[in-house]
Amino acid sequence: RSRGLGDVYKRQVRNHLFDQRRAVMVHWLILLNVVIFILGFFFQVDIPRNIYPPVHLDLIQLYGAYSEYTCFHEGELWRLLTYQFLHANLGHIMFNMIALWFFGPVVEERFGHGRFLLYYLFCGVAAALFSSLLGDMGFFDPEWRFIPMVGASGSIYGIMAACAVLFPHARVQLLFPPVNLSVRQFALAVLGVAAAVIIFQWNNAGGEAGHLGGMFAGFILTLLILWKEKLSSPRRKDASSSHYSPEPSSRRP
């Protein structure tokens, strides 16, 4: 019998909750981000003008946020990783962690725990580098290279890209606007928004460049993973079949 849309939603929710129980890395990432965000409230500082443009950060962000200047001109390369676990405000971390909780488990289940973590971190690094690349190409004000960048958004957008490749026809119900989209349509929509913000130089164009970089990196990396799996699968089949060598039949016609 045909299933109604309500049945589809129930099945998706049931499957998602089942995936959540096995999403070990997603749970640890969410916990780590939340703990670091809370700790930041106890270490509030004002940034001197000769280090950054006038902004207000906490002490953890001061030594963990990414900027092109501090990372490459001062050699603090660890910022490519640490900035991914820092967030600007409550809304920022809530959006990212909800998205990680929603999209992350199915990708972790597909990739495995270790490979998922490496994928997550790689997309975050690619997001920062892509943002700096566009800045060096003149898309943003030269001051951009000094402005601290924080957030897991680049990694999250990379996970969205993986979902769009692996599960393109899965459905996403948005609350605002209240529309139902496939994961592929949703990924293309957020990709279009990020591109428009960069092209028209709207607010947070540099941050949207990071989103775009994370999504591009995730798309390419997911395709490479699938390609590698496709190449190795015939070898696994050959190896398994080589263990079985039936004896020739003793019967004669």
Where do the model's predicted regions map?
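Alpha-helical transmembrane bundle and helix-membrane interface signal
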Residues: 109, 166-181, 226-235
